[in-house]
């Protein structure tokens, strides 16, 4: 009896401890699973919040709805055409300060380029439209719903301030016969912040620049420019050439190539959320057509451009001649301008004669 009692007494503690050990282990494993699940959900929620915020930063314009069907025909082999505008909007405190204070109201298209990406997307060409070009502005709808009548001999950069981006697209399509597929606009402050966010952009300054109006002073040679310096560089007109808009177009084109090279090297378009700081700066600055107005659409467009080498992108100024009535203005030079637009419309090689501008700004 005593032996049996001893055996029973030894077994009882063992039978009581085993369930407790299993329960404790289950609780630990269950706790780990719940923690991991919470972390996954939190990470997913954070990613969703980041994407939602970045998507919400992008402003858009429904170009197709605004322009309707009265547009150039989209040819099967026409590639892709993107209108890029640099807006000198004074909206917001930072834009106002960068734009030179309160002396100028409203906004204008300070920089305008038609970027043509041929079929296959292995190369591209950027055509700069001088802001002082006299154009025929078509009938456009204003933001209040009223119509802005057609007008001849108006400055190209005034179209934006009078009727907004859709009218700029319509004006470019009218003067070129080129169907614009996408629209992208960046403002003063956004340009500055984007350059600062990516760590600056290196450019090879072609000649000494001493612009008293902007305070930009650079010697010829390579310089890594921050955001404020970059903005002054692409906007300087008194520090180079004849002081007109034509002189600075070369600097704008050069800077665009350097900026695109930096963006491509950091894969900012292919993976726009890889760096939240950069993506936040970029998306806050952007206004696009509705087809590009999301991170997903921008990333897809960026990945489709991976085959394009910014170093081989051709940059051309729209051939212009000094206006006979006002030497401070220019007009499209014919037949060069017509040949240039025809080549872009048909995705053909641009003839050398279409790259020569009678007015150079030198």
Where are these regions (language model features)?
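Non-catalytic, solvent-exposed segments at the cell envelope interface
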Residues: 2-362
């Amino acid at each position: 009896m005593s032996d049996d009692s001893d055996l029973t007494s030894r077994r009882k503690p063992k039978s009581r401890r085993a369930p407790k050990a299993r329960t404790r282990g289950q609780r630990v494993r269950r706790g780990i699973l719940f923690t991991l699940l919470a972390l996954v959900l939190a990470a997913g929620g954070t990613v969703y919040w980041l994407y939602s915020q970045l998507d919400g930063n992008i402003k858009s314009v429904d170009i197709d709805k605004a322009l309707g069907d009265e547009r150039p025909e989209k040819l099967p082999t026409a590639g892709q055409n993107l209108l890029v505008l640099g807006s000198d909007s004074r909206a917001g405190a930072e834009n106002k300060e960068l734009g030179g204070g309160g002396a100028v109201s409203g906004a204008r298209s300070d920089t305008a380029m038609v970027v043509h990406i041929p079929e296959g997307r292995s190369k591209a060409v950027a055509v700069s439209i001088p802001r002082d070009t006299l154009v025929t502005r078509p009938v456009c709808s204003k933001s209040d719903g009223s119509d802005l009548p057609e007008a001849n001999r108006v400055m190209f950069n005034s179209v934006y301030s009078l009727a907004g981006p859709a009218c700029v697209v319509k004006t470019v399509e009218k003067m070129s016969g080129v169907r614009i597929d996408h629209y992208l606009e960046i403002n003063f402050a956004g340009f500055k912040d984007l350059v600062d966010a990516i760590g600056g952009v290196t450019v090879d300054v072609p000649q000494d620049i001493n612009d008293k109006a902007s305070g930009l002073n650079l010697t010829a040679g390579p310089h890594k420019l921050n955001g404020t310096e970059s903005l002054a560089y692409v906007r300087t007109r008194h520090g180079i050439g004849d002081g007109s808009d034509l002189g600075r177009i070369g600097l704008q084109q050069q800077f665009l190539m350097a900026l695109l090279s930096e963006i491509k090297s950091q894969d900012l378009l292919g993976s726009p959320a890889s760096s939240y700081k950069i993506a936040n700066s970029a998306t806050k600055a952007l206004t696009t057509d509705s087809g590009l107005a999301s991170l997903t659409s921008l990333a897809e467009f960026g990945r489709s451009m991976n085959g394009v080498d910014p170093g081989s992108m051709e940059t051309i100024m729209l051939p212009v001649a000094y206006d006979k009535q006002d030497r401070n203005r220019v007009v499209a030079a014919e037949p060069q301008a017509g040949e240039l637009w025809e080549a872009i419309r048909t995705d053909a090689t641009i003839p050398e004669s279409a790259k020569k501008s009678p007015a150079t700004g030198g």
